[in-house]
Amino acid sequence: MSMTRVLLVTLLTASSAFAQETNDPFPEPISSTDGVIRVNFTEFASVPDIDGQPARMMLLSDEPGTRRLFVNDMRGPLYSIDYDGRAVTQYLDIDGSDWGVSVQSSRNELGFQSFAFHPEFNRPGADGFGKFYTWTDSRNTAPDPDFTPGGGGDTHDTVLLEWTARDPSAATYDGDGPRELLRVEQPFGNHNGGQIGFNPTASSGDSDFGLL
């Protein structure tokens, strides 16, 4: 008990001394009548839970060709959202049994990392018509990876997939299975990919237009 009393006395003494030395440069309240910034929010859309767990959203992206927003859940689903936010539709579940992707999302950092729509996604006859890309962690570690960093073990792979929709404006994905473009071996369980995308400032005819 004596030690507690000593500490309390010391703290009180120090606090008192500190308070006496303080020189408040603004003794009067600063008026906030001009230039006040107010922050409000309105719920725009709600992405569904999975098995009672809230969606693990990673990226929200605009696809102006079909006038929709898209957002992914790291566990596999890709949702489309109307511009007014009223309709949220599952466009594709890349973890679905039809695709054989086997999304690895058992930990917070793992899962369906990112996606990108080709800038010509909704241009009939163009090379990028109907094409979009997903970048995801997968439990499948076959075929052999294109890149092996070394060190650690082969805990999972991160895979870049190309999907091709027959009708880009369809409510749900109507194409065949994806084409694998790149597979990277990950040596540790908390390693994964980052965001993928196209150069938003590139125009048709530029050297980097349509390059992921």
Region annotations inferred by a language model:
Residues 14-16:
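N-terminal signal peptide c-region/cleavage motif recognized by signal peptidases
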Residues 1, 18-20:
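Basic/polar N-terminal segments that are highly enriched at the extreme N-terminus
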Residues 9-12, 84:
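Compositionally biased, intrinsically disordered low-complexity segments
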Residues 20-212:
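Acidic, Gly/Ser/Thr-rich repeat motifs that build Ca2+-stabilized beta-propeller blades
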Residues 2-9:
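Sec-dependent signal peptide recognition
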